[in-house]
């Protein structure tokens, strides 16, 4: 195992979490205020549920989700096109030694939660969840 990798199950450092939250607020504020002049971004409401920082704080992975979950690829492409501008704006709003490189990803937690919920409602799983009436 590398010297810089944490063992599985160990939590994120408080600094990474705090910086990730600051970057998340900055990106969300920029997008909410219409700071990026792009027709795609101006016509979509975009939520930023999470930002994950690399251990050296030089890379920020910004997870985004367009409201309604439509046009995800179009929104990611528009954000990627303006990531230099967004990086500069984040650098102005968040006081860090280095402005983090930004990459955008779709937040798939909602889709995954929906898939699990759907799976739990299947007849086979429902049958397994019912209490046995044979045990008296």
Curated annotation (Swiss-Prot):
Keywords annotated in UniProt: Cytoplasm, Ribosome biogenesis
Keyword Transport in record: no
Q: Name one GO molecular function term.
A: ribosomal small subunit binding
Might you report a single GO cellular component term? cytosol
Compartments reported by the entry: Cytoplasm
Q: Which domain of life is it from?
A: Bacteria
Q: Which PROSITE patterns match?
A: RBFA
Principal localization reads cytoplasm
Please cite one Gene Ontology biological process associated with this protein: maturation of SSU-rRNA
Q: Quaternary structure per UniProt?
A: Monomer. Binds 30S ribosomal subunits, but not 50S ribosomal subunits or 70S ribosomes.
Role this protein plays: One of several proteins that assist in the late maturation steps of the functional core of the 30S ribosomal subunit. Associates with free 30S ribosomal subunits (but not with 30S subunits that are part of 70S ribosomes or polysomes). Required for efficient processing of 16S rRNA. May interact with the 5'-terminal helix region of 16S rRNA.
| UniProt xrefs under HAMAP family | RbfA
Q: Which NCBIfam families did the record assign? A: PRK00521.2-5, rbfA
Q: Which family does it belong to?
A: Belongs to the RbfA family.
Recorded protein name is: Ribosome-binding factor A
Q: Which organism is it from?
A: Rhodopseudomonas palustris (strain BisB5)
Gene encoding the protein: rbfA
């Amino acid at each position: 195992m590398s010297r810089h990798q944490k063992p599985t199950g160990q939590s994120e450092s408080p600094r990474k979490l705090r910086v990730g939250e600051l970057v998340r607020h900055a990106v969300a504020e920029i997008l909410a205020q219409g700071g990026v002049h792009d027709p795609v971004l101006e016509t979509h409401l975009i939520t930023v549920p999470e930002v994950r920082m690399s251990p050296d704080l030089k890379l920020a992975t910004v997870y985004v989700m367009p409201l309604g979950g439509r046009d995800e690829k179009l929104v990611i492409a528009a954000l990627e096109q303006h990531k230099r501008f967004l990086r500069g704006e984040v650098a102005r709003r968040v006081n860090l030694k280095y402005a983090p490189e930004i990459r955008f990803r779709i937040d798939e937690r909602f889709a995954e939660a929906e898939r699990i919920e759907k799976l739990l409602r299947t007849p086979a799983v429902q049958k397994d969840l019912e209490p046995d009436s044979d045990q008296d």
